[in-house]
From Swiss-Prot:
Membrane topology listed for this record: Multi-pass membrane protein
Region of interest: PGAP2IP-like: 243-971
Catalytic residue list: H826
Cellular-component GO terms for this entry: endoplasmic reticulum; nuclear envelope; perinuclear endoplasmic reticulum membrane; plasma membrane
Descriptive protein name: Protein cwh43
Tree of life domain: Eukaryota
Source organism of the structure: Schizosaccharomyces pombe (strain 972 / ATCC 24843)
Amino acid sequence: MTEKTSSLVFSAQYVALVHTICSFAAFFIPLALALYTHYYQVVKNEFYGYPEEWFPSVSATIGDWYPERSVFQWLIALTATPRLLVLLLWFTLSGISRPSVIITTALGVLRTALCGGWVYVTSTDDHDWHDIFMIGYLISNAPWFILVSKCSPVNSMASRIRNIGSALFVLTIFPLIYWYIQHKFKHIPGAYTVYAFFEWSLILWDILFDSALYWDFKPLVFNLHTSKTYSNPSSFATRKKEKGEHLSYAEAAAVGTQAKNIKKDSNVKCSKKQILFSLLYFSSEVYLSFVFWSVLTSLGLLVWYFPLWHMGISGYEACILFELSPFLLGIPLLRKFASKVPVIFLFLNVIGIAAYKLEDPVHRLFVTAFSVCCECLAWTSLFSNISPENLAIERKISTFLFGLLASSIAKYSFFSNNPIWPILNETNGGKQIPALIVGIIACLIFAIFHVQQTTANAVEHFKLRKITALSAALSLGTVLFCLHTFLCDSTVLMTWSWDGYPIKGPQPYPHGAVSIVVSICAVLVAPYLYQSGAFMLIGFVLACFGSYFMYINHGWCSYLGGLIFTSYVLIYSFASIRISSFYSPAKVWGGAFLVYILYSLAHVWVVAYEFVPGGPILRERTSYILIFIGWNLAALVPAYSGESKEPNKADSSVVDIKQSDSSYRRRSFKKSLLTGFCLALMALKFAIQNMPPYDYTPYHPNEKLFTAGIWTIHFGLDNFMYASENRIRDAVRDMELDVFGLLESDTQRLIMGFRDLTQVLAHDLGMYADYGPGPDKHTWGAALLSKFPIVNSTHHLLPSPQGELAPAIHATLDVYGELIDVVVSHNGQYESQLDRRLQSTELARIMRESPRPLVFLGYVVSNVGQEPQTILTRDTGMLDIEPADYDRWCQYIFYRGVKRIGYARLHRSTITDTELQTGKFLVTKDLGRNVRIDKEHVPESHRYPSLFEGTGVNGHYYDNNLVVHEPWYYD
């Protein structure tokens, strides 16, 4: 026997891990590159392109364009080595003398070769051979799945992953074939995009199946050394045992023994009744969490109504302090009561949904605030009642986050309005009655089945280094704010990434569903990741980069950065909430909601009006908030100090958290998976259902006529604190507006409910929509909607040295085949004459430099014939739509290069505080005499609707000023 001269020992799991990472990277890095560099090319197929098709197939991604094709082939080449090593290790592990193992290994080599065939022979190179290799690869998967599952060593985790992966793979094949037929033979628009999703799913399920080898290889160790092997296998085993080392599977096979002492996961079998009850309880918690997030996200929206209409501090802002109710748990009696019967507070929370029935805005606010008070007490108690060593807390966190995602899906289904918010009722889409019924049932189920859950076995110890209660509160408060700000609505990240036309990034429909599905996946994998200190550190760094790209960039880069950041926040939530259970709920949860409120105020102050006290401190400084978020998230990262078989009892700063046995976690995962699957299906349903057709027709296409309007809509809240989108839609439709601008329209903020008013208007009216500068631009919003295609649009932030930033949109429309520019702007307030003058000067420059016909729709804040209004018409060629209308102050319409044929001002009703101002124009070279004429001389098709004459309808009529009491017409 020779002596060893050198050696290298490492776990074989690393090989499986590298193989999984390389496999995933080989496909999804090229996908990201393709979406970023050749989006419109890769989504195009033989029948359709964008927007009918909006997601690329695997073949288009990996085979058609540089650099993604080269990157893919390079990464696949890197995958080859770990792939062959994995096959060799599995062959050694499973028994080299078994015929079935030999056949399976040979099949694995063949499968690898077939993969190389369709990788390096692309569909562009040779379509037939590419398909032959691809079909052969897919067919070989069936026996591969069966044989590997049968021949692999017993391991419950690996078996579970293989079962999931193979089942999903097989189930995906059938819809894949169906949608391919719909595309190839029936030529249905959008079918190939659906097919592409199933095709990419096959890749994921394939990688998932092979990733199970990571758990198979846990007892397998690489021991590379220069000496010869031991000649006597039994002596080798004896030496290993004398050293106290365990035999690996391969070593046990070599000496003819079996590893009998490997721990097997306990398999606790539950009856069908227990499974049903457990699922009902889980579902009730998800629904009650949905109510929690729905009510919490509505409070800021209700509070915002009062300073909005008072144009200053109203006093009702103090209602946000109801969120500090967890501080009351410092009272022992209340804490004990909330701990024993949390269902009472949950029930009061559900009853708060009925606040919508109260017509008085003040009463509605107070009831909602009380509901928030109860729900904060209830959920704080629910989390605090569970020991951090009890894995039931993981399930509780999962239901808490699924409830958040359910509220996001509810908003997604109603075009960014939550159907159970108090700003909705039976007339504008509210669904509170069904929500109340389900909520009461959920409370009953919760009351019946609510018991403390216990963990069956402690497999190993995981050490968390204690942090201070202050750090825990900062961390948790930051989590609550991030969950609310970035995840309560699936389109938040899209408005951050929006940069106008042509479209360079995601759209609410269908990509909002992508955001939801990614979030669901993050919640599902979080229990397996948040306990890893390495992941938390690396994830934190990636999340910081993600938030940076989300804020700095636009389009897909910003969106992907946001997805990385929000996914980390969801996973981080498990650690933050679990650690908070170590401390007094009054200290940590009360402190957390205080931090949350401070964040919320800062979130408002970044767009503070000039007259808001302290506005300059944070105005236009969202970057400061993101830095504070990163700083406070980092408070938790040092808590991870690594793993140990036995906790260090001498170190009093170390807290032991016992991990669950696999049976408990498996059952929890199954419930989470089922819930996530149902939520994902709903999101995909609404994404497909509300996909815009991008094929719209103006109201008078044969007349070459268009009607334009401008309306300041007060953030979509009417005089009675109800959502006004539907009423705005009806007025715009009845006025037959083809192009209109909306001002005070950026509602993608915490105090405005993260709504997107353009979604429902564009959908119901059949229009293209430009949201305007997003929430990252620190304005109060300007939006453009058009029946005509928006060829190009540019967003401007007008000079504002003293007050809030003023937004503007400069868009080019294809109006009956002619390019016509439209400018929509919202200038500063009366308090700052300097701002208004500089803003008007910049707008004049934009219009002067445009060579095309142009219509200006804006908020100027000026007397007629005085500065800054005259700055916009001086040296720009722009004409005031009606100079004789002296009763104007805010809204103005200017035009040039088109023929003015009509002008009307429509009463606002109770929608807002400003009328709808409109103009009718003809696209013609003959600009007419530019004189006013009687209505009788105007063709019927050129007239304004008679619907609003006299007393009008729905509170709208043609009399809203001292001058223009009916539509005026011109030649």
